[in-house]
Amino acid sequence: MRVLHLLLFMLVGCGAARVRRSRERDWAHHGASMFADLSVRELKAVRDYLHKLPELGLTDARSMPLTKNSILLIELHLPRKHDALKALDRGQAKPPREARVVVQFGNQAQPNVTEYVVSALPFPHSHRVKTFKRNKSIPFESRPMTFVEYNHMRRILEKITTQARTLLFETSGGFSFTNCTDRCLTFTDIAPRGLNVGERRSWVMLQKNVEGYFMHPIGFEVLVNHKDLDSEKWFVEKVWYNDQYFDSMEELVRKYEDGELVKVQLPEHDEEDLFSTYIPRGKSNSASDIHGPKFVQPQGPRYHVDGNFIEYSGWSFAYRVRSSAGLQIFDLRFNGERIAYEVGLQEAIAFYSGDTPAAMQTKFIDSGWAMGTSTFELAPGIDCPEIATFVDLYHYYDTDKPVHYKNALCIFELNTGIPLRRHFNTNNMGGYNFYGGLENNVLVLRATSTVYNYDYIWDFIFYQNGVMESKVSATGYIHATFLTPNGLNYGTKVYNHVLGNLHTHLIHYKVDFDISGRENSFESIDLKYVNFTNPWSPNDYIVQSKLHRTQHATERSAAFRFGKKMPRYFHFYNANEKNKWGHHKGYRIQLNSHAHSVLPRGVKEEKGVTWSRYPLAVTRHKDSETSSTSMYNQNDPWDPVVSFEDYIRDNENLENQDLVAWVTVGFLHVPHSEDIPNTATPGNSVGFFLRPFNFFDEDPSLASKSTVIVRQDKAGNPVVQRWTPARVGHCVSDQPFSYNGTYALV
């Protein structure tokens, strides 16, 4: 009975801690909902409203014809910043909630894509066309691939592979695309889809459909022209087999049968060969019957979540996961003072090199694959600690109903295992004057995107000293192609007949600073050597570094190019606000990146990613410049709907203005044998820090009660001074691991 009473006491104590709420701020709760993703109810209301409009002639997105008008995407349309700030800062009425809707008009003489803004939610009654800079229209060929188009692609591949069934069977060691059981072939399609504006033709490569099929190319690639909306008119333009090009399937098959080409025959498939799987193998010196360390919250979480609003250790912000791109935060404040209006992911690209046509064509622009919707379930204890708060997400993309993604975002507090601050002050006599330290606990907001082969882990990390870190970690499978004699110029052999292709990852972020208000300025700070006579030894001289500040008054001067010397500090500040010591209140951006440009300026495809020219560019805020890219740039990079270069071309003044920093981070990845079965996160994480630079009068983490100070009394005994309970609670979860992994229509 004593044990039962003890368990009940522990459960009650832990439960009470979990429901403990931090103090609420009316302004924050008033405004957070403006940035919340659309609810299932709102998504369905927008869909139903548009489907009832006879002039649009909408049909189901999943109906098989390509000649149809259908909804591709529904997501939140953000309010104008000025209107949002009136609600946040003045307590005025919130602007109406609106939806951004992408409609594909395939059932008309001149097919196109049109975007609408639908208002007001949850009871929509009006809509307007959403326009882009230069009134740029959206070509139909630039639309993303859909479930239906992939079904048609599979059908033409069935015809193609039936023609070459013997070739493929003999080449792959007993695999086929049709009439197969456990030895089937699958395919990967490549983008951009063509070489010029208006094209829609894709290189497709075949792989063995086994676990980790990305690592199993068979040496067959085909160029399919699928521009026509009648899939019966799709056709093969080119075929590549074992480093040889052919103009048609008929030519390939004839030359194969006549022995007029160089054949390749992969070894018989070994079911026991686990190289592309996660199944453990090899020798481990770690005990397999003992679990590793686990996280615990002795008195429950110390952060507060209310819908899409989060508070933690002085921080407060709202968040959303944009279906078209991914994680964003809004109204970022510390102790109630705004630092940024928006910090959000814009784009992720991976540009490859290779010797096969698919490899040399691969320039993935991930918003074109609806990167934000690839938010699948997170595994407790692996993707996030078991103690995390898990949040479900809902997306409406290439569907006829909202799709529910269970546990797709997580929030947790983490001890980093390294002090935030510490000092041991020795007395040089075998003792000490004092020891002081503060544990480094942070809040992590995390989501992932699995864009086909790659998995991106997106983190926003909030420190107690007013620092925010934005980090992306890359994992998942490498994009592999068939190894050719010339292939090692473009990567590394990672298995028999398999080349891991070199590629560059670049990630783009938007940081809309509002440092103590909207009127901000930007300067860079570097060092210059100075040489002067030593004032206390006139026959000698002093050489040392001196601060050198450069005020960037225009957008062009604040656009820093890759390949140029970079200043050490990027400082954003409010010239009208000072801290206690007379310094302008500011924050700086510190890059953690190994990025470089992916293509020379002037290359056709580079036009679609002009933001990739700059590790940092600063512009004036405009509501018309909400994002640096678009989901259409993937399939039409040659004349993109959104070109970031347009944002800085007008070269506007930046002094005492509402400033937006556009940050590019990334790294080169030359695959290596340790990328098998897939890429690990260590060394593959990049990002940036937002660090206070005279924003506070002192380190704000001094407010933390987790500080520990130890001094010696006169007898030499340690005297511990702390402001938290000396004993930690016992709320340790004993729940077994569970994982569902499914997502479903709702």
Where is each model-derived feature located?
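Cleavable N-terminal signal peptides of Sec/SRP-targeted secreted and luminal proteins
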Residues: 2-17
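Extended effector regions of multi-domain proteins
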Residues: 17-196, 201-467, 473, 477-486, ...
